[in-house]
């Protein structure tokens, strides 16, 4: 038994492909899985920035503030905002002549 499922044979009209085992359930299942894999890979590449950045940065909410007095919550939020503001200063603008 040959491992090849497709054989190209010359005919009067040109080359054509004769698939003997194309109705085999295993071949059909492999084709469907291959097509689904390709579709999912394309969708993953197209939505990479949206999904993974949201998972990486969107789910980080910080520690719970339950049971903490309101004044301490405001102080914590101010510290977090100051830390974000300081991070903006790390970027350097380079001007090319």
Curated annotation (Swiss-Prot):
Q: Where is this site: Seems to be involved in pH gating?
A: 41
Q: Pfam families per the record?
A: Flu_M2
Q: State where the protein is found.
A: Virion membrane; Host apical cell membrane
Can you name this protein?
Matrix protein 2
Q: Show which residues form the site (Essential for channel activity, possibly by being protonated during channel activation, and by forming the channel gate and the selective filter).
A: 37
Q: What is its main location?
A: virion
**Extra facts:** When the channel is activated, one or more imidazole moieties of His-37 probably become bi-protonated.
Which residue(s) hold a covalent lipid per the annotation (S-palmitoyl cysteine)? 50
Please give the Gene3D superfamilies that the UniProt record associates with this protein.
6.10.250.1640
Q: What are the start and end residues of every segment in region (Disordered)?
A: 60-81
Q: Which GO terms describe its biological process?
A: protein complex oligomerization; symbiont genome entry into host cell via pore formation in plasma membrane; symbiont-mediated suppression of host autophagy
- Lineage of origin: Viruses, Riboviria, Orthornavirae, Negarnaviricota, Polyploviricotina
């Amino acid at each position: 038994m040959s491992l090849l499922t497709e054989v190209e044979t010359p005919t009067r009209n040109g080359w054509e492909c004769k698939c003997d085992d194309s109705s085999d359930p295993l071949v059909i299942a492999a084709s469907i899985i291959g097509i689904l894999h390709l579709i999912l890979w394309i969708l993953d590449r197209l939505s990479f920035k949206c999904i993974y950045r949201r998972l990486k940065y969107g789910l980080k909410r910080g520690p719970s503030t339950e049971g903490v007095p309101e004044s301490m919550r405001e102080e914590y939020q101010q510290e977090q905002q100051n830390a974000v503001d300081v991070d903006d200063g790390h970027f350097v603008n380079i001007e090319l002549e």
